[in-house]
Amino acid sequence: MENKTIVKTDIQIAQSADIRPIREIADKIAIEEEDLEYYGRHKAKIPLKYIDEEKIKKSKLILVTAINPTPAGEGKTTVSVGLCDGLNKIGKKAVLVLREPSLGPVFGSKGGAAGGGYAQVIPMADINLHFTGDFSAVEKANNLLSALIDNNLQSKKHNLNIDPKTIVWKRVMDMNDRALRQIVIGMGDKNGVVREEGFNITPASEVMAILCLSQDFEDLKQRLGNIFVGYTYDKKPVFARDLKAENAMAILLKDAIKPNLVQTLEGNPAILHGGPFANIAQGTNTIIATKMGLSLGDYVVTEAGFGGDLGAEKFIDIKCRYAGLKPDAYVIVATIRALRYHGGAKKDEYGSPNLEYLKKGFGNLCKHIENAQNYGFQPVVAINHFATDSEEEIKFLKDECAKLGVHAVLADEFMHGGEGMRDLAKIVVEATEQQSDFKFLYPLEESIEAKIEAVAKKIYGAEGVVYSPKAKADLKIIKDLGFDKLPVCIAKTQKSLSDDEKKIGRPTGFDVTVRGFEFAAGAGFVIPILGDIMRMPGLPEVPMAEGMTIDAEGNISGLS
């Protein structure tokens, strides 16, 4: 294996890559050139006609998740990219299927989100910025509904008698901007009804969740029409269909519903589509993109946001349930750095070797392994390799996983791309060939309380669930509206298995508290809210945007 020394930034590596015309990537997965909808030479949209339900049944779906992350993240996307490249290295026809990045985190605290090192999707700058305009389309569709709501409030002929104080629908923008969380609109003469309003970030929009859970265009329209807006003055529910909004919203999404084809640094096909967050929504790419990948490749590598307690749970209990899919392999990304953190290491300590911290933090990984087993999987652990990992620590982690009957394999994609992922790829292929006793955590027929309890006890490790008075009142409304047979999409912190971000490692003896409920009638899930969840993030003290530059030739630096 060639020993590469990383001296370049991610964007420098991406800019120096031998990027191929997208038609060559399409050829690898048998997409006809006349069917490609080009966005320049290196990006294209794929028509939905390439979804093949019979082929889907024969292909293997590999889900990549992670332990609870440190603030820096644990490289789940990087491992996913590397695993796809590794599978292709060992002769498998693998396709990568990921979410699209949000501009908010790109310019905020995270920077780019297209992988890292020698395991990236390209064109990296395009992907991290406007890409093919899908997020803009979601934003416009969301805000069209907002405009129709406010227009109806002052309509004299077609007024639905909506009580402005009950409107739950908010405008969105794909930027971190705390100043827009709570605003007042309609100020001034004849400018509309004055009311309180606010902005969410675009990935938090229900339109994004709907796009990602829709099976086709008709399903998309129906779900858009089912969006709950608020109540009339006589307490009747109002939906987007009552405002005749669904067709116009769908028109704005007519291209956004088509998946985007790009490539990895090694020239393997990557489909990027959709981008809901996993702490406040389902955190996975679109059903359409996943099915497209399974139709075009023999193996699909996909990821679910944050740790297994958030993205993976929602991937399985929401996305797979609606899509009729099930993963064939379950990969948990773990870093020794993060396990030191879960063992009590401080920010200035978890980047240095320390076996004692690792031993104390191993419980977090152990719980995520148990969670995979709750679904009937025997997971594979990918140890995302950092230069600060000691041989002693690596051996400890492999040995402890082996005691649980689980393969733990070093993932060296950051330094070596697909070549550094051959061993992991072989183990994952073996995992896809094993029979799993797959099962959901709960049946839909159960009560909302029983569903929450199933997730809280089986996945988080909680003793029980406590409901605030507001949560009890919200729950009655949900039951009265007939939405209690939907799956639950629990909104909580990604930093802990519990609902308290300070409880790192593997907390025990705790209850989780449901503070309130929201429901996404269009997307098709109920949202129990655990803790304080921010739907419009703010920028950090020193945002990533301040370190970015662009020269006279349009070359960008500082994007990652």
Question: Where are the model-predicted features located?
Answer:
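Flexible phosphate-sensing "switch/lid" loops adjacent to ATP/NTP-binding sites
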Residues: 2-560
